[in-house]
């Protein structure tokens, strides 16, 4: 199976109508969407998701923000998708993100940086399992697969 990553369009991205733009960037890159849903996360889900930041001063605000509205949760699949997605997304601080990246083009403030992406294989596995049931992920082959990747 190809590598998978978890991507979430945060409430600011949903409210600003950026879902289609962001989905398009991943599709044009050639990655395969295997899971997609819109959900307003519970506090429990948000606290689990951001658990690594529990002792940080911004934790409560982060949880409040991510639970403030709908999030579009996605699982993308493809060769090197985790590293490639991180490049597509750009630096966490939008003012440090390169033009052409999602955050470089669409975000201004670290507290409203539009999107989350897993940073490693272990994180992706944890986040996918947290946000999705196995039955919600679709194993399928695009008809243009031979035009996307060699082999």
Swiss-Prot record:
Residues annotated to bind ATP: 10, 58, 86, 92, 103, 113
Chief place where the protein resides: cytoplasm
E.C. no: 2.7.4.6
One Pfam match: NDK
UniProt-listed GO biological process terms: CTP biosynthetic process; GTP biosynthetic process; UTP biosynthetic process
GO cellular component, as recorded: cytoplasm
Catalytic machinery residues: 116
Domain of life: Bacteria
Catalytic activity: dZDP + ATP = dZTP + ADP; a 2'-deoxyribonucleoside 5'-diphosphate + ATP = a 2'-deoxyribonucleoside 5'-triphosphate + ADP; a ribonucleoside 5'-diphosphate + ATP = a ribonucleoside 5'-triphosphate + ADP
Pathway per the UniProt entry: Purine metabolism
Protein keywords: ATP-binding, Cytoplasm, Kinase, Magnesium, Metal-binding, Nucleotide metabolism, Nucleotide-binding, Phosphoprotein, Transferase
Subcellular location: Cytoplasm
InterPro entries xref list: NDK-like_dom, NDK-like_dom_sf, Nucleoside_diP_kinase
GO molecular function terms noted in the UniProt entry: ATP binding; metal ion binding; nucleoside diphosphate kinase activity
PROSITE patterns the record matches: NDPK_LIKE
Endpoints of the signal sequence: none
Cofactor(s) of this protein: Mg(2+)
Function, in words: Major role in the synthesis of nucleoside triphosphates other than ATP. The ATP gamma phosphate is transferred to the NDP beta phosphate via a ping-pong mechanism, using a phosphorylated active-site intermediate. (Microbial infection) Catalyzes the phosphorylation of dZDP to dZTP, when the bacterium is infected by a phage that produces the substrate for the synthesis of dZTP (2- amino-2'-deoxyadenosine 5'-triphosphate), which is then used by the phage as a DNA polymerase substrate.
Family affiliation: Belongs to the NDK family.
Subunit structure: Homotetramer.
Identification of the protein by name: Nucleoside diphosphate kinase
Natural source organism: Synechococcus sp. (strain CC9605)
Lineage of the species this protein comes from: Bacteria, Bacillati, Cyanobacteriota, Cyanophyceae, Synechococcales
């Amino acid at each position: 199976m190809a590598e998978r990553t978890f991507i979430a369009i945060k409430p600011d991205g949903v409210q600003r109508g950026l879902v289609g733009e962001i989905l398009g960037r991943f599709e044009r890159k050639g990655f395969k969407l295997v899971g997609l849903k819109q959900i307003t996360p519970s506090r429990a889900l948000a606290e689990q998701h951001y658990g690594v930041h529990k002792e940080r001063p911004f934790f409560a605000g982060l949880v409040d923000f991510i639970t403030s509205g709908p999030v579009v949760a996605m699982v993308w699949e493809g060769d090197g998708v985790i590293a490639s997605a991180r490049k597509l997304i750009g630096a966490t601080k939008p003012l440090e993100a390169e033009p052409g990246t999602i955050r470089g083009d669409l975000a201004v403030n670290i507290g409203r940086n539009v999107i989350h992406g897993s940073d490693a294989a272990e994180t992706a596995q944890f986040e996918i399992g947290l946000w999705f049931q196995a039955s919600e992920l679709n194993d399928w082959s695009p008809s243009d697969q031979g035009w996307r990747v060699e082999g």
